[in-house]
Amino acid sequence: MPKVTNLNHRLRNIMKSKKTLLAIIIAVAVVAIAAVLLIIKPWGGNDDNSSSSAPDSSSVADSSTPDSSSATDVSSSEPEEPAKPLTPVDYYGEMKVVDGKIVGSKTNELVRVTGMSFFWSNWSQKYYTKDYVDYMVDDYGCEVVRCSYGVMDDGVPYDTSCEPLIEDVIEQAIERGVYVIIDWHSHGAHNNPDEAVRYFGELAQKYGQYDNVIFEVYNEPTQVLWKTVKEYAEIVIAEIRKYSDNLIIVGSPQWSQKVMNAATNPIEDENVAYTLHFYAGTHGKWLRDEADKAMDQGIAIFITEWGSVNADGNGAIAKQSTEEWFQWMDEKGISCCNWAINDKEEGSSIFVKDSNNELTETGIYIKELIKQRTDNAPWKKAS
């Protein structure tokens, strides 16, 4: 029966093939089901019988809510950054004139900050850098720096290429949390208010929202009537006020010494102070008396420039007179900036000519004075 035998043999082979195919199909199905189960519920999930080695429930996301607990766990495992120390601007905030005093908007306390003034920008560009801001803050202890944008007597800047450098100083002062005065450093600014309007308008738009920034619209008027200075200042102030309510400082006639002129006819703006300039080798009690009378009339004073030598920038350090001025400023709570960050061969420069930041006798003395004042500042005690 060969044909029957062959038929049986073929049937057995077909049955084996079907069984093999069925086994393969079953195996594939099992693998697929297992994969689906793993996707739906990761291995070792939230079963009541999970072992102690399973992940904590707080680290497993709930499908119905954001995984906030997981984010917390991750952040808590990272080392915490040390708290940043307070800076003068952190502590005081924006400077405001209230009842003839300059106070901090955050503390409502009298603000008394001390620092340095840069020299004329057109003659000292090498110092208008972020590194020198850091040097003044870290080495001298400055709470404020002053940018002196050099402007000719016709009211036109000597060199507009200085403007980006001044902005570098402004931005680094903001970064370091100290105040920065933007000074229109001229003896004849009233002759061309348009240039000042352009410049202060641009910077007020760019930096006027920062508490650090103070605008000084006229450094030192000389032999000019206060009426003329006031008219110029009002034009520039109106432009600044389009963008910023920050403190504005205005100079007065005779190299910013006739503050009584301003006191008897002040500018109508809620946040304006007036600058008084002194040089200890030349100016004494008579100028302090003038300032006292002006403050009694209700105006605020900020000494944006002072020197320990003669008014021409030369001469020896007048230590006794300087100490008398500082005692008076401490009693009145007046802020000040020393002249000047420069290496010109004159008594007021803090650096030796063409040196690598070697301090002059003046530089050493001024550094000690500033640090004595700022080391005991309220913002440091609050840190």
Residue ranges of predicted features:
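Hydrophobic single-pass membrane-insertion segments
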Residues: 36-50
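Aromatic-lined substrate-binding rim segments of carbohydrate-active enzymes
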Residues: 129-188, 192-198, 237-243, 318-332
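N-terminal, intrinsically disordered, polar/charged segments of Gram-positive cell-envelope systems
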Residues: 47-88
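N-terminal Lys/Arg-rich, disordered targeting/topogenic segments
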Residues: 1-16
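Amphipathic alpha-helical coiled-coil/heptad-repeat segments
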Residues: 29-40, 59, 64
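N-terminal substrate-binding region of glycoside hydrolase catalytic domains
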Residues: 83-164, 187-191, 302, 308-313, ...
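Extracellular glycoside hydrolase catalytic/binding regions
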Residues: 90-96, 120, 125, 141, ...
